[in-house]
């Protein structure tokens, strides 16, 4: 098991910043970080998901246009704590995640990847309580989402 798992392309500044920060954190954290050449070109799906499942934290840097990326949802499903980027690839700050979920989310949001060591210190201090809280929230969110869809479908 590791503290942080990340595998991804360096396609824009936010991902470059994360990659650089991860390289400075090996002394105090067990980190598996892989820079890949392209989408799905870094490792097998099995190895990727085994890395996610074995991690306490999975940084979720911004997608190409908005902060959204499926890595955040993979982290939630793999019971890793995502650290959600609040900036777009162009560096614009967005309160995206609370807007998307329609509520205050239990996972951390970040605007400066240089703050990652401080986030890790807090996460480790509260672990595993924080992952239990997040997992309960995520299961309830999915359940409520399903009920809303069924309610609309059934009229």
Predicted regions and their residues:
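Nucleotide-sugar donor-binding catalytic core of glycosyltransferases
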Residues: 1-104, 109, 137-154
């Amino acid at each position: 098991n590791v503290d942080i798992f990340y595998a991804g392309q360096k396609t824009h500044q936010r991902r470059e910043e994360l990659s650089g920060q991860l390289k400075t954190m090996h002394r105090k954290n067990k980190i598996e970080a892989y820079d890949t050449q392209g989408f799905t070109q870094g490792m097998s799906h099995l190895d990727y998901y085994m890395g996610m499942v074995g991690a306490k934290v999975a940084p979720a840097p911004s997608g190409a246009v908005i902060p959204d990326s499926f890595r955040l949802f993979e982290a939630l499903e793999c019971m890793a704590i995502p650290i959600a980027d609040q900036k777009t690839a162009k560096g614009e700050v967005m309160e995206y995640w609370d807007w998307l979920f329609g509520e205050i989310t239990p996972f951390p949001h970040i605007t400066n990847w240089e703050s990652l060591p401080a986030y890790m210190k807090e996460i480790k201090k509260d672990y595993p309580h924080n992952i239990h809280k997040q997992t309960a929230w995520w299961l309830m969110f999915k359940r409520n989402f399903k009920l809303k869809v069924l309610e609309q479908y059934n009229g």
